[in-house]
A protein has these predicted regions:
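Multi-pass alpha-helical transmembrane bundles in non-GPCR membrane proteins
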Residues: 1-217
């Protein structure tokens, strides 16, 4: 399962740079959970932020497990954890804007996670397409005044635009890492590891975005 990633596979951890860089998600996830600057009490984001932090922890641990063991189960968890982030972004957007009741949002998140998990299991080669299908709608929603209550020129929404820019750069580096021209298998500086780090930064910027665009009950 590690054939599409540049870094050389050795003993445990199988891919050192990619394994260690996964802890960027753990670091920022713990930051979200313990931050004293969480969205204010009485806002929907105050309830949503811990779920974001837990999802980031899930991504970090799953990614480490995959790159350390290079097992098919680890690969499944790694991709599935990213699916849950995309789903949280989508259902979280509808919930925090009051377009979807909390209970329905949670039920939709769980049901969609099961469905896409089964799709990933049945069609593993479609994992990148499925990830894009899940991630893009949530990003689009968070870019609109329909969800945030603020126009694109508002200073309140800078974090989601910054997160999108970081994610685009990270994705570009991820693609380059799969090219023989940019692949140095024995190097500790791996494009996939940079993808992990920038992806964690982008996820943390979602937390800042929640904090800057709160919705009171």
């Amino acid at each position: 399962p590690g054939h599409c990633i540049c870094e050389h596979a050795g003993e445990f951890p199988g891919q050192l740079a990619n394994s260690v860089s996964s802890f960027a998600f753990v670091f920022f996830g713990v930051w979200v959970l313990l931050s004293r600057r969480n969205p204010a009490s009485g806002t929907r984001e105050h309830r949503l932020a811990p779920l974001l932090g837990i999802t980031m922890l899930f991504i970090g641990v799953s990614s480490f497990f995959y790159h350390a063991t290079l097992s098919f189960f680890g690969q499944f968890l790694d991709i599935f954890s990213m699916f849950t982030f995309g789903l949280l972004l989508f259902f979280g957007a509808l919930y925090r804007a009051g377009r979807l009741h909390g209970g329905y949002a949670l039920a939709g998140f769980v049901a969609a996670s099961v469905v896409f998990g089964l799709l990933q299991f049945a069609y593993p080669d479609a994992r990148r397409i499925l990830f894009a299908v899940l991630l893009v709608p949530g990003i689009i929603l968070e870019l609109t005044p329909f969800i945030t209550g603020h126009g694109p020129r508002s200073r309140r929404v800078w974090a989601i635009y910054a997160g999108l820019a970081v994610m685009v750069v990270a994705y570009g580096i991820w693609l380059l890492d799969q090219s023989p021209v940019f692949c140095e298998r024995g190097s500790l500086l791996q494009g996939h590891a940079i993808w992990h780090t920038l992806g964690a930064v982008a996820a943390f910027l979602v937390f800042i975005h929640y904090r800057l665009t709160p919705h009171h009950d």
